[in-house]
Amino acid sequence: MSKATYKERAATHPSPVAAKLFNIMHEKQTNLCASLDVRTTKELLELVEALGPKICLLKTHVDILTDFSMEGTVKPLKALSAKYNFLLFEDRKFADIGNTVKLQYSAGVYRIAEWADITNAHGVVGPGIVSGLKQAAEEVTKEPRGLLMLAELSCKGSLATGEYTKGTVDIAKSDKDFVIGFIAQRDMGGRDEGYDWLIMTPGVGLDDKGDALGQQYRTVDDVVSTGSDIIIVGRGLFAKGRDAKVEGERYRKAGWEAYLRRCGQQN
């Protein structure tokens, strides 16, 4: 588990995307990623307007939106990301052969590679998924892109454990510049081999313990103390009538204080 500061890690990271993200985290004093699964662009943009100042990263599932368009959804999202200084992460969870994911990432309705700074993929199909996605990014844009591998999940009964997790970590080692880290519940090591992987952890909640569909929540302190660099919070920010601005600051503060404790800068 890294005890270096985000600023220190930004200065030495081989990935431009990861370095930019670490710098944003340092400058805004936040390690909060907002996961906003809503059905309309209007709802999405309203929540982003409220949460933008508190987050380092926005995680989307644009295939949930009933009215998605590049002009009506992506353009204003990119404007908000510039206004409030956060990156965009499309939680696509690619899981197919290299040529197929290359097309899914670059083409179709969503053209993810054009606008999302970060996306993610399962390791189930092997290292070809990394090379396919990287090729797509290089062909579509000159902007740097980053990939997260799904090493562990937060849902009850997940099969992403043990040898599967180990195999996914091995796949991540195939490309130090493009693969920037993992969706995981804990530190994934690698520093002794020269890797500085970002760990992003979903299933973080200060109030709820889970839901009826198998989601299991862990506290902010728990995930950060076991190696998470970025806490991913969804319904805890806006569901059940919650005030997104209030909850955004609450989670930002909790995440930042947990990070300072991990780095030895706060008791």
UniProtKB/Swiss-Prot annotation:
Signal peptide: none
Gene encoding the protein: URA3
Entry annotation: catalytic residues: 93 (proton donor)
Residues that bear N-acetylserine: 2
Entry keyword set: Acetylation, Decarboxylase, Isopeptide bond, Lyase, Pyrimidine biosynthesis, Ubl conjugation
InterPro entries referenced in this protein's UniProt entry, alphabetically: Aldolase_TIM, OMPdecase, OMPdecase_AS, OMPdeCOase_dom, RibuloseP-bd_barrel
Location in chain, cross-link Glycyl lysine isopeptide (Lys-Gly) (interchain with G-Cter in ubiquitin): 93, 209, 253
Name under which the protein is recorded: Orotidine 5'-phosphate decarboxylase
Reaction(s) catalysed (UniProt annotation): orotidine 5'-phosphate + H(+) = UMP + CO2
Species assigned in the record: Saccharomyces cerevisiae (strain ATCC 204508 / S288c) (Baker's yeast)
